[in-house]
Amino acid sequence: MLETLRERLLSVQQDFTSGLKTLSDKSREAKVKGKPRTAPRLPKYSAGLELLSRYEDAWAALHRRAKECADAGELVDSEVVMLSAHWEKKRTSLNELQGQLQQLPALLQDLESLMASLAHLETSFEEVENHLLHLEDLCGQCELERHKQAQAQHLESYKKSKRKELEAFKAELDTEHTQKALEMEHTQQLKLKERQKFFEEAFQQDMEQYLSTGYLQIAERREPMGSMSSMEVNVDVLEQMDLMDISDQEALDVFLNSGGEDNIVMSPGVEMESNPNQNEMSLQIPSPSESASQPPASPSACTDLDTADAPLIQSDEEEVQVDTALVTLHTDRKSTPGVSDDSDQCDSTQDI
């Protein structure tokens, strides 16, 4: 292809030069034909000069165009050379591609064999993975059994140690219980003896005073509430009651005053010896909360006294007050059965 292009360029150049030659020959023939043959004429130098200058200009333009064509031909030649080199490279690459395409069937066969080997390897890998998982399960079971055995041994040792500690603690508790039981029994016996002694002394004092004076003056011999006898001795609830109704209290005062005048007539010596500032004995009815919270007092103790200026109460009047107090106490116990039950329980525990 390039050779034909070069041949065409050379033929164009030859045609161009041959055309120039023919033009020059025709111009010469025209000059020769244009001369008159019959009558000679004088040469005109100015016309020749113009014609020569015209020819020179034409030849200069032709030479310039020929040079431009030569430069363009050289440029085209260089481009053609570069194009030929490029096409040579492309031809070599096409040849290589053709050779590689010819090798494709063999490559496909190799790929098929590789795929088959990969499938076989995949199956073998799955089998190995299953075997490894089974081995891991076996190892885990062995480790679990070993851990179970260790924990069982540890549990047995812990049970033995705790059993020994429990036996020692039981023995210690048994010794402490026996010791405390002995101490409790001893203290209970001491309390019972002291209580019996206190009752005997109180009863003896009451009997002596009653035999000497004919009435009981309990307020003078009242123990403090914080003493042992007032806190631990079971006291009759009748000695802690007080008549809270004002009308009943006034009627009782009138009755007691009338009874006191009779007693003054019967025993004037006793009235002179008694202190006029002494308070009369009153029966206080405790509320359920107070009866549950207050500790029992001694059997010879009584409640607080009312205002002074009242005569002392004789034994006959005490029986009247006790009867009225029993009625009120019976009604209170019916209304509050829990308090009486608590007092009975306290009495039973103290008797024990």
UniProtKB/Swiss-Prot annotation:
Signal peptide extent: none
Spans annotated as Disordered: 267-352
GO cellular component, one term: axon
Ranges in a coiled coil: 88-176
Keyword flag Cytoplasm: yes
Keyword vocabulary terms for this entry: Albinism, Cell membrane, Coiled coil, Cytoplasm, Cytoplasmic vesicle, Endoplasmic reticulum, Endosome, Hermansky-Pudlak syndrome, Membrane, Nucleus, Phosphoprotein, Postsynaptic cell membrane, Sensory transduction, Synapse, Ubl conjugation
Posttranslational modification: Ubiquitinated by TRIM32. Ubiquitination leads to DTNBP1 degradation.
Start-end of Polar residues biased regions: 274-285
Deleted gene: phenotype: Null mice exhibit cognitive abnormalities including schizophrenia-related behaviors such as impaired working memory under stressful conditions. There is higher acoustic startle reactivity to stimuli. Pyramidal neurons are hypoexcitable on dopamine-2 receptor stimulation. There is reduced expression of Ca(2+)/calmodulin-dependent protein kinase II (CaMKII) and CaMKKbeta in the medial prefrontal cortex mPFC. There is increased expression levels of cell surface dopamine receptor D2 in cortical neurons. Expression levels of SYN1 are lower in both cortex and in the hippocampal formation (HF).
Composition bias type Low complexity, residue spans: 286-301
Family recorded in the similarity comment: Belongs to the dysbindin family.
PANTHER family (UniProt xref): DYSBINDIN, DYSTROBREVIN BINDING PROTEIN 1 DYSBINDIN
Annotated disorder: Defects in Dtnbp1 are the cause of the sandy (sdy) mutant phenotype, a model for human Hermansky-Pudlak syndrome (HPS). Sdy mice lack dysbindin expression; they have a characteristic sandy coat color and have much fewer melanosomes in the retinal pigment epithelium and choroid. They are fully viable, but present behavioral abnormalities. They have prolonged bleeding times due to platelet storage pool deficiency, and lysosomal storage defects. The number of electron-opaque platelet dense granules is severely reduced, and the platelet serotonin content is strongly reduced.
Function as written in the Swiss-Prot or TrEMBL entry: Component of the BLOC-1 complex, a complex that is required for normal biogenesis of lysosome-related organelles (LRO), such as platelet dense granules and melanosomes. In concert with the AP-3 complex, the BLOC-1 complex is required to target membrane protein cargos into vesicles assembled at cell bodies for delivery into neurites and nerve terminals. The BLOC-1 complex, in association with SNARE proteins, is also proposed to be involved in neurite extension. Associates with the BLOC-2 complex to facilitate the transport of TYRP1 independent of AP-3 function.
Subunit structure: Interacts with AP3M1 and TRIM32. Interacts (isoform 1 and isoform 2 only) with the DNA-dependent protein kinase complex DNA-PK; the interaction phosphorylates DTNBP1 in vitro. Interacts directly in this complex with XRCC5 and XRCC6. Interacts with XPO1; the interaction exports DTNBP1 out of the nucleus. Component of the biogenesis of lysosome-related organelles complex 1 (BLOC-1) composed of BLOC1S1, BLOC1S2, BLOC1S3, BLOC1S4, BLOC1S5, BLOC1S6, DTNBP1/BLOC1S7 and SNAPIN/BLOC1S8. The BLOC-1 complex associates with the AP-3 protein complex and membrane protein cargos.
Protein name per the record: Dysbindin
Organism, scientific name: Mus musculus (Mouse)
Lineage of the organism: Eukaryota, Metazoa, Chordata, Craniata, Vertebrata
Gene: Dtnbp1
